[in-house]
Design a protein with these regions (language model features):
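Ribonuclease/tRNase effector modules and their secretory precursors
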Residues: 1-121
Length: 121
C-alpha cells in the first residue's frame, strides 16, 4: 500500500548484513517475492546499498537491502529476518539518498510500466 508509512527515517548504512530467516509475513508475500527474485536473477542485479530505517516499529529498525534494479528486500535489523520486498518506484528509491544512475532509473521505469510494483502478494 502506498502512503501508509507515517515514519521513514534514514538512520545510516551498513557494510554487511546477515540474513537469519523469515517472519510469518513471507507466506503473505510469496508472489511478489517470487517476481522480485526473478528480476534480480534475470537482470543480474547487485546490492548497491544497505540502509537502516527507523519506522518507529516496536520490533526495532529495518535493514533495507537496495538492489541496482530497484528491488528492495526489507529485514528486521536486529533479528535478520525477512519482512517484505518492494519492487520500488523511483521516489521510493530516492528516499535512501543514493545515487540513481540512468540504467537503474530505466529498470525502475520498466518495472512500473509493467505494473510489477503493484503486485500485492
Amino acid at each position: 500500500m502506498r502512503g501508509n508509512n507515517k515514519r521513514f527515517q534514514l538512520v545510516g548504512y551498513l557494510e554487511k548484513f546477515t540474513i537469519r530467516g523469515n517472519t510469518a509475513h513471507i507466506i503473505e508475500r510469496s508472489r511478489r517475492l517470487q517476481v522480485a527474485e526473478q528480476l534480480i536473477v534475470e537482470e543480474g542485479a547487485k546490492v548497491c546499498k544497505i540502509a537502516v530505517i527507523d519506522k518507529g516499529h516496536k520490533n526495532g529498525n529495518e535493514a533495507h537491502v537496495v538492489y541496482d534494479n530497484g528491488v528492495v528486500k526489507i529485514y528486521n535489523e536486529r533479528t535478520g529476518k525477512f519482512i517484505t520486498v518492494l519492487i520500488a518506484r523511483l521516489p521510493q528509491i530516492e528516499r535512501y539518498r543514493i545515487n540513481v544512475p540512468p540504467a537503474m532509473k530505466q529498470k525502475i521505469k520498466s518495472h512500473v510500466e509493467k505494473g510489477l510494483n503493484e503486485i500485492e502478494f
